[in-house]
Regions:
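Acidic loop->beta-strand submotif enriched in PP2C/PPM serine/threonine phosphatases
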Residues: 17-30, 123-161
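Regulatory cytosolic signal-relay segments
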Residues: 1-18
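Beta-strand-turn-beta hairpins that frame and shape the catalytic cleft
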Residues: 3-6, 29-32, 99-102, 144-147
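Residue-level marker for buried hydrophobic side chains located in beta-strands
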Residues: 36, 107, 149-151
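Catalytic core of PPM/PP2C metal-dependent serine/threonine phosphatase domains
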Residues: 20, 49-119, 136-137
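Membrane-embedded alpha-helical signal segments
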Residues: 28-31, 35, 46
């Protein structure tokens, strides 16, 4: 069976912002494809800088075989601290597809990745652990033909709050869409 991986991303700038606060980076190694989504705190230029730094650091470190512990520690020490909020903050989701057979998902503070299997949203096991004071969610999923993963920042579930949707766009609605 010949299996291939298709990856696409779409980002929308927040209203009246020149840059998007979300960044996606794709890194290829000899045995894996690594997709990284990051959302920087705030919006516009500041958020873009934070998310770009996060994806670049994670991409470089993971490509070089570093552990997720080392990655999280490096991000915590590297991101510039916001003068207003006094924190350095960026969310991330990593999807590492190894040999087109296994997906490893590592998530920090983004909405959980949606797995569509045979056109239906399905649950998958998630293990939680704390690294450098941050709760990291990890999953390892054996792949099946035509599996679809949907990773998103909090911009998706928060879309339309108070306008089209009173309470935002629910995860199950996003999966159905």
């Amino acid at each position: 069976m010949n299996v291939s991986l298709d990856v696409c991303s779409k980002s929308l700038n927040k209203r009246e912002e020149e840059l998007c606060g979300d960044t996606v980076e794709i890194v290829k190694t000899t045995d894996a494809d690594i997709i990284i989504l990051s959302d920087g705190m705030g919006s516009g230029v500041k958020a873009n800088i934070l998310s770009t730094l996060t994806t670049r650091i994670l991409g470089t470190m993971l490509k070089n075989g570093e552990t997720i512990e080392d990655c999280v520690e490096t991000i915590a020490m590297t991101l510039p601290i916001c003068k207003v909020r006094q924190v350095a903050y960026s969310t991330f989701t990593i999807i590492r597809i190894t040999d087109n057979t296994t997906a490893e998902i590592i998530q920090f503070d983004n909405p959980n990745v949606i797995l569509l299997r045979n056109g239906k949203s399905v649950d998958y096991p998630i293990v939680s652990r704390v690294i450098e004071g941050k709760t990291i969610l990890e999953s390892r999923i054996p792949l099946q033909l035509h599996d679809v993963f949907i990773a998103m920042s909090d911009g998706c579930p928060h879309a339309g709050i108070g306008l089209a949707y009173n309470f935002g766009w629910k995860r199950e609605d996003i999966a159905e869409f």
